[in-house]
């Protein structure tokens, strides 16, 4: 890329992402949530079971799963009652115990961390019986206060998948596909440089990888990831390590990869972009750390492009009745 083009591209990105009249970035940007979960110190000090509890900051999901499998029902219940925050957010803990620990936050809540803007994951469908699992990874401005939209997308995808399964007589309704709305990372907030860099996406990719490792540790099938907008940056960075059968991106500013080969994954890559999506006006470049690179719907990228002509806007890819949601459901059910 010529020096002039680099300068012009940087100027365009700065104008789009910092100087927009829609808002201004905060001076410091968002801080990715890190550090031990609340209650970790009490958890590690608990010797009531006469055995060492797994360290939430260092134990792998597989190690956590093995630990809980060796406990009696009474011992498991004691940990849920005494340490709900740790049990409810520890990847590798059985699904039913996480639900119980997170019950004050709602039904079928798989993770709930109220620190900062808050992180949450909620399940639509019967996760413990599901033959297929999907995870929706949202983009910017999603946290506990704005989570309802992502939860609605999960419910709509699950409903479409159930309709498809019923029509194909593949599985009983409700058992075939479960969809997890995963707001499990700190997303960019407002208009600003966080949208143009991979800083928050890198932290999100680590969290997503651990989350999917946790699903695998409790015996669930490898999920299909549905990654919206900035969430597709998260999925792109997670691709080499994440346990997924499919990665589906929509309204994507780029995945920080030149093509599917650069993603270094065995997962199938799908992409959708509506002609009415404003993301099409964002330059698909990466210069000096700004921008997220190639358009996943471009022919050179190599993803399988899904229909999206009837999607009316950037945040409408899961709208019932659209060809895009129909295609998403086929992927979620394992039909494509």
Report residues per predicted region.
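Lipolytic serine-hydrolase domain surface
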Residues: 127, 139-143, 148-155, 160-164, ...
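Gly/Ala-rich beta-loop-alpha elbow adjacent to hydrolase catalytic centers
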Residues: 226-235
